[in-house]
Amino acid sequence: MSKVLVATTGTEFDAQAIDEALKLLGSGHEYLILTVLQGEVPAIVGDGGGIAPVMHIPPETWIEQEKQDHVLAERRIRKTLSELGSDVEIRVESGDPGERICAVAVEEGVDLVVVGSHDVGTLRRVLGGSVSDDVAHHAPCPVLLIRHRDV
């Protein structure tokens, strides 16, 4: 039985990526569903290309919000996987999604990483890249990209 890491980032595309992975791979695998929530304040790029200042938010507020985000992400994933008969582990972590996904793939010795992919636009790809690009280039094993389809 192979070990498959299905990586999600707490977006609305998660259920679709998980569904597609299960359709393609079937139930004869051990699944690790990893959701990585980016636990930092994103910078805002203004119209002129400058970075807008981000207002200060107390750490306690961020910590509480992050806890709530973890609970909601796990609840959504459990709902999506309720009919699956395979061995499933769910983990929710914080940090840089690309880095954490690749690190967990190494730690767990997975055979395949499945990650959703959608068009983030050329500017964003140049400035910050995308999670799927990062994982595709740095994962220690094969990567299956599930392209987001418009619904």
For the regions a protein language model found, what residue spans apply to each?
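General small-molecule cofactor/ligand-binding pocket signal
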Residues: 32-34, 89-93, 144
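A short acidic, glycine-rich active-site loop
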Residues: 54-72
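Structural beta-alpha unit
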Residues: 13, 79-113, 150-151
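Small/aliphatic-rich secondary-structure junction motif
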Residues: 2-57, 86
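Glycine-rich, Arg-bearing micro-motifs that act as flexible, cationic patches
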Residues: 112-138, 148-151
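Conserved acidic residues
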Residues: 2, 111, 140
